[in-house]
Amino acid sequence: MEQRISIERLEQAVNIFGSFDENIRLLEQEFNVTVVNRDGELRVEGDAEAACLACKAIQALLTLSSRGEAIGEQNVRYVIGLVRSGKEEQITELTGDVLCISAKGRPVKPKTIGQKEYIKSVLKNTVTIGVGPAGTGKTYLAVAAAVQAFRDKQVNRIILTRPAVEAGERLGFLPGDLQSKVDPYLRPLYDALFDMLGAETYQKYLERGNIEVAPLAYMRGRTLDDSFIILDEAQNTSREQMKMFLTRLGFGSKIVITGDTTQIDLPADKTSGLKEAMRVLRDVEGIGICELTNADVVRHVMVQRIVEAYEKYETARNSGKGGKR
């Protein structure tokens, strides 16, 4: 069966096909169809059902392209997932909605429905808890929202923090002064800020006290007013640390807590403050809880495959069918 889709502009076809036709090859492979660009039309040939699904995917990609989105492998795979679950109409929800402009002029915006719901919660609620696997953009989008709130003068400070003890290491055994000890743990936060502001602007705001990047222990005893506060890697907080952090909230401030509950480095006898907070605060007004999944992974496709493989392994192990720990 052959189906045809009209292409209004050559640039759209180029964007849809991708570099060396890699996008269209991926569609052909996933749906077992053949796609040809001829006389201003995309001609899709294959089994009737497969051709129909492929056309839906192409239409969704055209919608993204018409709104200025540069189509890449991640877009294609995400659209394929939406089409297969019958949710391709949701793609219209991802057009527009620029959250922030990076230092290099690149628009930062949600790339999946899960990310969009996460950002909606961040903008709406006083406290948002965002959990999900690596690569879902939890921290990066939170930093983008913080930078935009600062640019819009909604807050006077951006405060980024995370537990300083991870992966079995203890700061006292590491060489150097306190700053050199904690810097490696805070590097992902620095990277996100550099991307949004540029190194020079970041340094200027840091010296003025508009930006603070510090270990969680530095939050104790403070009340943080007019600030956008992000707690990253929150799965490694104890219940006491989490309660301490949440009660730092001051007037005119917003808190975003991010973490991955499958990557807890605490001793086995310690309760994760993040997991407990999700249970305790789920129905509290003004607090939003967003759970991202591997469908929201926007890094290299291998990251998504790795996340899925570990999820399958953990499920099998927990049911007594997996290998030894």
Where are these regions (language model features)?
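Short amphipathic alpha-helix segments
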Residues: 12-29
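Hydrophobic side chains in well-ordered alpha-helices
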Residues: 16, 23, 54-57, 242-245
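Conserved helicase motor core of SF1/SF2 NTP-dependent helicases
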Residues: 41, 103-231, 235-325
